[in-house]
């Protein structure tokens, strides 16, 4: 990594992208809060446990980088390339991730509290056990994404594509999944207490053992969904398509 960074320090004088002093700081230690590393090539870099709070990493190449346990709170990663990076246990609370690429990245137990991931393409990615509290995933592509045991309390997933996603035992209390497409998704044992599921497609979804207490299922499709052992006390049903195709209007006013 040192040879790569030395080359980049010489190149930076020509392009004026990142700060050479900040690059040197990153090379000599694990603390680089508020550093400007914009457009730097840090592919395959060993950055586990590094402190990059508030750092500028716009359009930075972090593909294949080892960022396990890294502190990236409030960092600007807009347009950054994180393909195949290892972010296991990393903290990205409040980070700016507009147009960041995560293809093949390892995201287990990552913390993304309050981040904005609208329209992000995260299809097939692994977020098992991740903290996604208050995250905005509206319109995001989450097809076949692994969200088992993820914490999605008050998360915004309006219009998200969750087809065949795995949300088994995920915590989705007070989450907004209105208009989401969750056809064939796995919500087994998930907690959807007080979740907004209006106009959501849950056709053929697995909701066995799920908690739907107080959830709003108005205009929702549950056609051929598995509701074995699910709890739905105080849930609202209005023009809801039940698993057998019958329309439930019990909660219409």
Features from the language model and the residues they span:
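Residue-level detector of intrinsically disordered terminal segments
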Residues: 8-9, 106
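Absolute protein N-terminus
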Residues: 1, 17-18
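Sec-dependent signal peptide recognition
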Residues: 1-8
């Amino acid at each position: 990594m040192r040879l790569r960074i030395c080359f980049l320090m010489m190149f930076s004088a020509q392009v004026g992208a990142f700060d050479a002093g900040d690059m040197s700081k990153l090379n000599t230690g694990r603390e680089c809060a508020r550093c400007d590393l914009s457009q730097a090539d840090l592919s395959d870099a060993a950055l586990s446990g590094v402190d990059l709070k508030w750092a500028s990493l716009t359009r930075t190449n972090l593909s294949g980088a080892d960022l396990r346990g890294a502190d990236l709170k409030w960092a600007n990663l807009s347009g950054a390339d994180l393909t195949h990076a290892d972010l296991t246990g990393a903290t990205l609370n409040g980070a700016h991730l507009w147009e960041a690429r995560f293809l093949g990245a390892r995201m287990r137990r990552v913390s993304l509290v309050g981040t904005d991931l609208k329209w992000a393409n995260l299809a097939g990615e692994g977020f098992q056990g991740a903290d996604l509290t208050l995250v905005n995933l509206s319109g995001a592509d989450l097809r076949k994404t692994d969200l088992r045991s993820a914490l999605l309390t008050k998360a915004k997933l309006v219009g998200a594509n969750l087809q065949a996603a795995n949300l088994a035992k995920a915590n989705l209390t007070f989450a907004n999944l209105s208009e989401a497409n969750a056809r064939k998704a796995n919500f087994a044992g998930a907690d959807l207490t007080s979740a907004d599921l209006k106009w959501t497609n849950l056709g053929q979804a697995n909701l066995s053992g799920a908690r739907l207490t107080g959830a709003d299922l108005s205009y929702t499709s549950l056609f051929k969904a598995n509701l074995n052992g699910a709890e739905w006390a105080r849930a609202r049903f209005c023009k809801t398509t039940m698993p057998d195709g019958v329309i439930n209007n019990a909660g219409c006013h």
